[in-house]
Structure formats: C-alpha cells, structure tokens
Amino acid sequence: VIGAPLFIISGPELVIAQCKAGVIGSFPALNARPQHVLEEWIVRIKTELAEYQEQNPDAKVAPFAVNQICHGSNDRLMDDMATCVKHEVPIIITSLRPPAELVEAAHSYGGLVFHDVINVRHAKKAAEQGVDGLILVCAGAGGHAGVLSPFALVREVKEWFDGTIILSGSIGDGYSVASSIALGADFAYLGTRFIATKEANADPEYKKMLEDSAANDIVYSSLFTGVHGNYLKPSIVNAGMDPENLPEADKSTMNFGSGGNTKSKAWKDIWGCGQGIGRIEDSPPVADLVSRLSEEFNDAKDAFLSLIHISEPTRPSLI
C-alpha cells in the first residue's frame, strides 16, 4: 500500500506513522511552506524512521515519498527537487507533466520516480521519460481523477509497461487492496481512507463528513482547480454553491505557485474525496487502520482461495 500525497493534510506525523506501519507514506512538497520547511520535514522523517528501525530491528519500515507538481505555475519545483536530491528522498511522485529532468535527478542517487496518469496516452508519455512506475488514477479516485475503469486501464498498460504499477481509485479497505493486486497492480494507492486517521492534518469536520458520507455524496467537477476531480458534496453546499449546477473551468485556472491559489478554496474548504468513502466509519490511528487493512486483505485472499477450492501455494486453472 502507498498512502497518496494529500494537499494540506499530509505532513510528517502522517507520513511517519504510515512508514512505521509498513505503508509507503508521502506528502506534497508544497505542503511544506515556506520552501525551507521542506528540508526540515525530510530530515525529521528520515531521523525518526531511522531511530524507530534501530529500536525495532524486526519491523518492516517502509520508505517515504515526496510529491512534485510539474506545472509552470509551481515556482518552487526545481528548488524543491534540489532539496530532495540533497537528502536522497527514496521515491519521487510526480504529477501533471512527464518530468524528464526530475527522473534524471532522482536516478542520480538511486531514487525512484512514480508518475500519476489518467489514460494510456499520458502513461506512454511518462514511460518515454524513463519513470520507474505509473500511478493509474482511475474512476472514483479522490481529488484529481480520471474516468477509466481500472479493469481497462491496468490491463492495457500492463501489455507494454514492465515497470511498477500502482492503482488508485475507490480503494477504501483491504478487500479493495486485494482486488487491486489480483488485477495486476503492484501497489494500491489510498488517499481518502488516510484522511480519516488520527495523524492526518485535516479539519475535524472533514473527518466527520467522511465518516457520515457515502459514494452518492461525491461530485465530479473541474470548477475548483481547472482539472476534473471528486469532491464532497456537503462541503460544496457549505461553501454556498449548488453542487448540481457547477460551471466548468479550464486548465488555465490552475495555479501551484508558492503563494498558492488565493482565489480558489479547493482543498481548504472544498474537500476532495474518493468514491470508496462508504467504508469509512471512524478515524483511528494509522497503525490500527493498517492492521485492519491487513486483516481484510487476508480475509479477501482466503475467500477467493476457498471459492476456487484450492489451498496455497497451488496455482488455479481457469480452463
């Protein structure tokens, strides 16, 4: 499992808890403001994880990742990447433009680059730049999301891409994680489920809204950032807008500058959310959630093996 980078919400506390629990934790570089805070966060994460590993030598501590937004309005991009190179961040997650220069920078110290895409055309462009993995953001993902079914996108990409496949979209429990792996993904990418955790830097009302809502409370719109994404309907209503009559926006409204997009309240007041929300009923500590995910994953695996009347490690025949 990879914990997706969550704008505003992902900070050192959440990332450290995820990695200690064996989940790859991540955060957007732009969450660390001003720019020099990014180095402080990276040093803190590396230090605390190293200390935890030393104190718990048998623990499976996962690496962490930093998300870079590759857009012309992000005036911090190269400075942020220089900081990541300096401290040899294990994984760089890139969004929007295929990042040739970032791939080269990460590979200079042995780092990996995973790029998020919503269709095959974008996936091929990213693969041409030498990324190590593709994050397939399918229908139902929280925040910026695509519209393709994972059954279509995962299987088509695997026909030609030999790198790491990460699946995103409506993955809210261990059963969904197991389904992702069965489909051919190497990792499941969970964002919304980690918003509703003790360590997440989210408004308590946001967490409560996640616990109280379901899939039919999700609205897909481009209004708030210029790119289509999934958002919580009640948060749109609370902001004084009609979720059933939202105008469309275009990509020219996107702004990832160091000062932020002062005109848009996306992420702060308009809350992103995936369609897997129906399984969220509480906001536990990350460690407890990951333990639950593991139990559900194993339950799903056992149910499948029982269904086809075999026991591990025999491989089933579908003929």
Tell where the protein language model's regions lie, with residue ranges.
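Short, flexible helix/strand-to-coil boundary loops that buttress conserved ligand/catalytic motifs
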Residues: 127, 199, 314
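Small-residue (primarily alanine) positions within well-ordered alpha-helices
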Residues: 123-126, 180, 185, 319
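Active-site entrance/lid segments in N-terminal catalytic domains of soluble metabolic enzymes
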Residues: 1-164
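Tryptophan-centered motif/residue detector
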Residues: 7-8, 41, 267, 271, ...
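Conserved active-site-proximal phosphate/metal-binding subdomains
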Residues: 147-166, 172-307, 311
